[in-house]
């Protein structure tokens, strides 16, 4: 009788271990999501750096916060916290000569990707760097973060 319970316990333990262990498909999914996030961030940066952007100097006056050390997916919480101010600055910069296409859609995509990548962890508190960043430095910082994480996955 105990033998059957022991075998059942072992079988359940093995099932739990195999289901919770990261698989190559989950790594591939994470990599794809990071690549999409990277492309969205680069698209925003390219739109801002567009030489026809008459509001660039105004956009550079707004300051953003970067984490002291972003090395894990949970640090995407810090990006999520800055998305609303980022969207507001991008909306202020819209003009008839300069228009970031689909800004709201890009920010929405970034938000969805960040939520999926960082998981449901909400107890993480960001430690921000003491120095603030311009919008260009902010986007470059997160682009570098994505590239760094992608390189560890490949």
From Swiss-Prot:
Signal sequence segment: 1-20
An MF annotation (GO) of this entry: cytokine activity
Any one GO BP annotation for this protein: adaptive immune response
One Pfam family here: IL2
SUPFAM superfamilies: 4-helical cytokines
Subcellular localization: Secreted
Sites carrying sugar chains: 23
Tagged with keyword Metal-binding: no
GO cellular component term, pick one: extracellular space
Cysteine-cysteine disulfides: 78-126
Keyword vocabulary terms for this entry: Adaptive immunity, Cytokine, Disulfide bond, Glycoprotein, Growth factor, Immunity, Secreted, Signal
Function: Cytokine produced by activated CD4-positive helper T-cells and to a lesser extend activated CD8-positive T-cells and natural killer (NK) cells that plays pivotal roles in the immune response and tolerance. Binds to a receptor complex composed of either the high-affinity trimeric IL-2R (IL2RA/CD25, IL2RB/CD122 and IL2RG/CD132) or the low-affinity dimeric IL-2R (IL2RB and IL2RG). Interaction with the receptor leads to oligomerization and conformation changes in the IL-2R subunits resulting in downstream signaling starting with phosphorylation of JAK1 and JAK3.
Family from the record: Belongs to the IL-2 family.
Protein name, per record: Interleukin-2
Gene that this sequence comes from: IL2
């Amino acid at each position: 009788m105990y033998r059957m319970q022991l075998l059942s316990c072992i079988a359940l333990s093995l099932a739990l271990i195999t289901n919770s262990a990261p698989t190559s498909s989950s790594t591939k999914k994470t990599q794809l999501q990071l690549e999409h996030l990277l492309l969205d961030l680069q698209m925003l940066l390219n739109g801002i750096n567009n030489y026809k952007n008459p509001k660039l100097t105004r956009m550079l006056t707004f300051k953003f916060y970067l984490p002291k050390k972003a090395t894990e997916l949970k640090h995407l919480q810090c990006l999520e916290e800055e998305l609303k101010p980022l969207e507001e600055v991008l909306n202020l910069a819209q003009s008839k000569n300069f228009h970031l296409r689909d800004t709201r859609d890009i920010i929405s995509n970034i938000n969805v990707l960040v939520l999926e990548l960082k998981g449901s962890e909400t107890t993480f508190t960001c430690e921000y760097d003491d120095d603030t960043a311009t919008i260009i430095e902010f986007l470059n910082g997160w682009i570098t973060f994505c590239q760094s994480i992608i390189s560890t996955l490949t």
